[in-house]
């Protein structure tokens, strides 16, 4: 059946901001789907709130709305656009929940909008825990013994009957939000309550724990004619009990017998048919390793994180084909775009092993609870491909950018036996490395299996790596031995450490013995059909399938896994750069290792290498391809950090030179450049030890801002107010050395200003100036950015332009630069980044300028004048746009939600309107804030903020909010004639701050941080409780000011009429 002719216009719902559990995989899926529908001649309307996506570029759909993904906004777009159909299954859980809500409100029926692909009844059957369980019973498929409850009271009976542990799974949530495994009565009560709050239908499934069984996932596709195939079967390294997003995953399945596989394949096809899903679907199983007993854990009736992994692992573009299936195509009518000869109805076959390892943010959040369970905590992931499991695994490990390229984590050597075994039994993000440490200490595979429940097969593979390491150390190095360990995935850096050699000596020896990788093609069919796909992975075999073409090429380095501080914004810039290189007639090559992103879609570049971003792996690709040069500007700090080693090996870095990159990143060279240009900067110094740091701070005067050099996302950055804090920071937060000095600046409070600019070496063009609502001291990535700026005079804006032009020329920028200023009576330069920044997508969207594209054109030699730009600033927009950060604190237990100089947000949203208040309202709503127009405001304010907070409290009071405060703050408010409900401090008897938050009596918390130890502890507990209860908690008074502006703009003023006057005489 060809595409449906009765549909002309389709609305596609995106997934919104990046949060833990829903990341860049939906940008990849949504972009694929929109382009596929446009390819078929449909008019495509897109709504999404995330500006940092290729999906929201004006070229992806016919019309793009960057608006909050809330029913009232999407309803308005539907009534305005009148689409014939809605495609919601590519927008993750957000898209499904929106479709469900729009249907419930009658919007789809009233406007005659058909839901494409998977029908609502199937979504409800898969997402509603009770209906799903009943369907599995009907089909005769096992589900763990379970019960659905809507209240805590009704949950106790199940707990008493079954006993602990119990798994709690909320309905209609993302990444296991609100769920977990309860091991006792106390944790059961806490998780059930949080699960009921997290579920939009107040429903949780209580399930007898099957933790310890094998976890297997099947990615399935089906069309309207009931053709169904398995795209990919994947197996988790970790047994059931760890969320699949936090688990290491291998494809194809490694330990299933043919009988196991065929059984689960049949069950998967049975389930997708019973649900009537048209498109992609992910099914998760628990399999008893000692019998043929299986349980169906859950079904995701949509494109998911696993779909993106399966697409990249197999080369089969699930989202693209799912979109075409949704408009009526059969799988047997669709050509597989990889082979261009076989059809989409052929199940992919793999002749390699794929390993996925999650990337966590615990390097930024050392206080976080690192234990893994059913609630996802990873911010991103890496994927690697090898000819064997060991090679794929070790390539994935070095893709994580953890500062190591092997399984030996040195700090684990300090664990005693009890600590080690605790780490084996209770999984954390370091589980893989802890298992390897146990093998190093002589634990047997069988003992480790009993402690971890990890399949013996995987433990044997890890043991093989350990044995190979031992042989390498103990026996003379021969070409045969070196080839053996290279085939197992050992890197030159790891081999050099094991042999106490220099890395370059290992590389030289390898070349001498002609031990070089070749590149194999990912073709979906294990070479059964001819394939032209330019999608490669490196391995140590004989035949090279990545034969260099005659065309001149340019290599772009990607940004690796998504983490806090380096998100999807960098992939956005990378994709634009690749497009520009292709349009200029060059062959565009990319190296990246993130399966979630658009840049690793094989159709984006001319040649894609799915490889680790290390010096060794990048140099090998360069030797295979011999490009004209390498662009490092768009890959964040990952790519910038490779520039020096690449140039040392004779590689040409295109754009800003390495020397100039270093001048911007090296403190002394940076200060010298600013002094030469007579540009002001906050007074600052560098220190390499505690004594130097104390002397520097005394000279500068407290408070000071301290941070390590060469970091992204403000990692380990703090504002310190006294010597004892500084000494603690120097001893515990950083490892300072002559090579890695600590930067110490006078801390200036003022308006923070941010600029992205493009320079061709002669001219400097500024797309726009952004101001931050939060004053300097809150990381720019966690601040609300406003464009065009609302508080800057024309004179100050001109000064920003003049400074930007001077800086771009002084640092000899070729391409992009990002500058951060602070205005505090004068304009100070905080930092200059000679690369793409996280604001590039936002400034591109609000100005209509494709910033990364223009920057790439200048890198390739086109002048700004030739592009019709020259020197100056782009005309300001009439409308006002805001970029609002989005946080994932509910998923990261023990992380303090207070804002400061270290970045904590995982994503962002954008909103545009005619006034700042309207734009802010939309932005705050899109970021998930519940804006109350009445209710209770709890204020706990540090002494140094009290004067400013009182003025804000008066405005809340005038708006009719009820104020709540502890004694110190309450005294201040009452002294200003405000009514206050007093609540006790945490340690006091009676009604306390925590009890009113836990009871749901508070609509907004304003909590500013104090340096008093007891107050600090109380503040942390308040902020954490607020995060877990879903109560809005603001820690910056600037954000409170912005919120008040919004509430005041939404509130009607009630004013009594004045008395009559007659000719100036009162009547």
From Swiss-Prot:
Binding site residues for Mn(2+) 1: 284, 298
Pfam families: CPSase_L_D2 (PF02786), CPSase_L_D3 (PF02787), MGS (PF02142)
GO CC, one annotated term: cytoplasm
Positions contributing to Mn(2+) 4 binding: 831, 833
Residue segments, region Carbamoyl phosphate synthetic domain: 547-928
Keywords in alphabetical order: Amino-acid biosynthesis, Arginine biosynthesis, ATP-binding, Ligase, Magnesium, Manganese, Metal-binding, Nucleotide-binding, Pyrimidine biosynthesis, Repeat
GO biological process, one term: 'de novo' UMP biosynthetic process
Enzyme class per UniProt: ligase
Annotated binding of Mg(2+) 2, by residue: 298, 300
Region (Carboxyphosphate synthetic domain) residue spans: 1-401
Cofactors: Mg(2+); Mn(2+)
Known partners and oligomeric status: Composed of two chains; the small (or glutamine) chain promotes the hydrolysis of glutamine to ammonia, which is used by the large (or ammonia) chain to synthesize carbamoyl phosphate. Tetramer of heterodimers (alpha,beta)4.
Function per UniProt: Large subunit of the glutamine-dependent carbamoyl phosphate synthetase (CPSase). CPSase catalyzes the formation of carbamoyl phosphate from the ammonia moiety of glutamine, carbonate, and phosphate donated by ATP, constituting the first step of 2 biosynthetic pathways, one leading to arginine and/or urea and the other to pyrimidine nucleotides.
Protein name (database record): Carbamoyl phosphate synthase large chain
Annotated source species: Exiguobacterium sp. (strain ATCC BAA-1283 / AT1b)
Designated gene of the protein: carB
